[in-house]
A protein has these predicted regions:
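Active/binding-pocket-proximal capping segment
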Residues: 127, 198-202, 237-242
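Feature captures eukaryotic membrane-trafficking machinery centered on endolysosomal pathways
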Residues: 92-94, 208-243
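Non-catalytic, conformational "gating/processing" segments within enzyme and secreted inhibitor domains
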Residues: 1-121, 131-210
Length: 243
């Protein structure tokens, strides 16, 4: 069983360029295990317009409980797309990857106007059908970016997904589904990976108006292929000081 664990984890580590090293926890395979399915997704995206590392400075990030942490913030004069909605703004950071084969990848950062506004923003988005795939379902105003500050962040998340699938009404002939995701965002771009094991027993025009986009409080991020609307990674940053 230990050899099975090592073999699966070694394969996942190789496929995700070392971002995920321990998908299967110890003793997850046993003599009663008949079958293990494993898949992995790795995304390494370079910003179309990279941040200058020499401009990265430490600043305060405000947590939901009212406390603050000091973290490195990337900054720069990017001519990026900004959509202004009631109560929040969405910054679109395109990647270079995919331009040559008629695809387009980007990271969208959803920043609530209020420092403690993430829960209410998530509730509003969850109640708006199809918004994450097509942002045009809500009225917005196009704008430019005046001051841009985004924290560097890196974190991993894992959970047992079988219960969630059962809640959705899916009948899965498996005893366990382990899902783990990892993402790292810095001045060059972002590296993201996701893995799962299943065990059975261009240029834009901006209006003159510009807004600051200072992500110094909890926000939502999405990595997507924006031509099809396919969401590759989704998460929220609560405390960028924690890895």
């Amino acid at each position: 069983a230990d050899e099975v664990n090592k073999e699966v984890n070694s394969w996942v580590e190789e496929q995700t360029n070392g971002l995920i090293t321990d998908l299967l926890p110890p003793n997850s395979a046993s003599p009663l295990t008949d079958l293990i399915f494993a898949n992995a997704l790795f995304f390494n995206g370079r910003w179309d317009s990279q941040f200058n590392p020499s401009l990265t400075k430490e600043s305060d990030f405000h947590l939901l409980d009212g406390t603050k942490v000091r973290v490195p913030f990337m900054t720069g004069a990017h001519e990026d797309s900004l959509d202004v909605y009631e109560g929040f703004k969405v910054l679109n950071l395109p990647y270079r990857e995919g331009r040559e084969d008629s695809r387009g990848f980007s990271m969208q950062i959803y920043l609530p106007d209020e420092k403690d506004g993430l829960p209410s923003m998530l509730e509003s988005l969850a109640s708006t059908r199809g918004f994450l795939k097509d942002n045009k379902v809500l009225p917005s105003q196009k704008a430019g970016v005046k001051e841009l500050k985004i924290p560097r962040f890196k974190f991993a998340f894992d959970f047992e997904a079988l219960k969630a699938l059962k809640v959705l009404g899916l009948k899965v002939p498996l005893s366990t589904i382990i899902h783990k995701s990892c993402i790292e965002v810095d001045e060059v771009g972002s590296k993201a990976a996701a893995a799962a094991a299943l065990r059975s027993c261009g240029g834009c025009y901006f209006p003159p108006k510009k807004y600051d986009f200072v992500a110094d409080h909890p926000f939502l991020f999405i990595v997507k292929e924006y031509i099809s609307g396919l969401v590759l990674f989704l998460g929220h940053v609560m405390d960028p000081s924690k890895h």
